[in-house]
């Protein structure tokens, strides 16, 4: 049976020096109000998607050092410019020594730019879609990113959302271990049924505690690891 969030928080607090110390750790990863997320320019949404995609499998320090070159090469991640890159532009990117020359990831930026452009045409802006999406259907937002975007499945989409300030759980090794301990899932979530169970658990813990998904996710992880 899943325990109440107060018990989970107490476990994490005991490992991290008490409730005040734990709250200070959680405050290091703040979420943003929906109005602030909605005001994010869509080029920054696309840039965050690109950053997370290129970080996967590479040193984050390497990507950070190269990031100004990425911004220049992808024209500031202007969604329209990236969505409709001609073949010669793609070829130039594949030959650009200033960035990571991974063809699949470069093409993923183009595919995600098209998604951002489409969402803006449908609902005003991609950032607005993310901001308005109800936390109670967080897994639905993950599914949108996975199915309409490229390379945004797994924890990549989760990390994009958290980086944008959306309350977000991330299925890290420690967080998954806590979910298994709490009998939410039997293994790392992979199926729709698994993610529905995680969503239900987070909805319940949020209702009990008044805390958002980012704080709950980090608290769970901190009952296991650093």
Q: Which stretches of residues belong to each language-model region?
A:
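N-terminal polyanion-binding entry modules of DNA glycosylases/AP lyases
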Residues: 1-102, 106, 219-226
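C-terminal accessory module of base-excision DNA glycosylases/AP lyases that mediates lesion recognition
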Residues: 1-32, 130-226
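Alpha-helix C-capping/helix-to-loop hinge sites
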Residues: 52-56, 77, 96-97, 116, ...
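Short helix-capping/linker segments at secondary-structure and domain boundaries
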Residues: 56-62, 116-124, 184-185, 224-226
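Alpha-helical ds-nucleic-acid-binding substructure associated with the helix-hairpin-helix region
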Residues: 75-151
């Amino acid at each position: 049976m899943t325990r109440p969030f107060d018990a989970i928080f107490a476990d994490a607090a005991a490992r991290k020096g008490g409730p005040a110390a734990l709250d200070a750790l959680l405050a290091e990863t703040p979420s943003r109000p929906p109005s602030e997320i909605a005001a994010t320019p869509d080029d920054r949404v696309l840039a965050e998607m690109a950053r997370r995609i290129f970080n996967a499998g590479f040193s984050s320090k390497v990507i950070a050092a190269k990031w100004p070159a990425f911004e220049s090469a992808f024209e500031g991640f202007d969604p329209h410019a990236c969505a409709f890159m001609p073949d010669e532009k793609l070829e130039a990117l594949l030959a650009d020594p200033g960035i990571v020359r991974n063809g699949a990831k470069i093409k993923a930026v183009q595919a995600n730019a098209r998604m951002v452009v489409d969402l803006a045409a449908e609902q005003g802006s991609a950032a607005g879609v993310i901001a308005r999406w109800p936390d109670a259907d967080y897994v639905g937002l993950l599914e949108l990113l996975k199915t309409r975007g490229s390379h945004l499945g797994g924890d990549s989409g989760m990390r994009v959302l958290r980086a944008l300030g959306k309350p977000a759980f991330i299925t890290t090794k420690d967080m998954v271990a806590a979910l298994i301990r709490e009998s939410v899932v039997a293994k790392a979530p992979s199926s729709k049924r698994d993610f529905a169970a995680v969503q239900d658990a987070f909805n319940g813990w949020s209702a009990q505690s008044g805390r958002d998904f980012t704080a709950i996710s980090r608290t769970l992880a901190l009952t296991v690891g650093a």
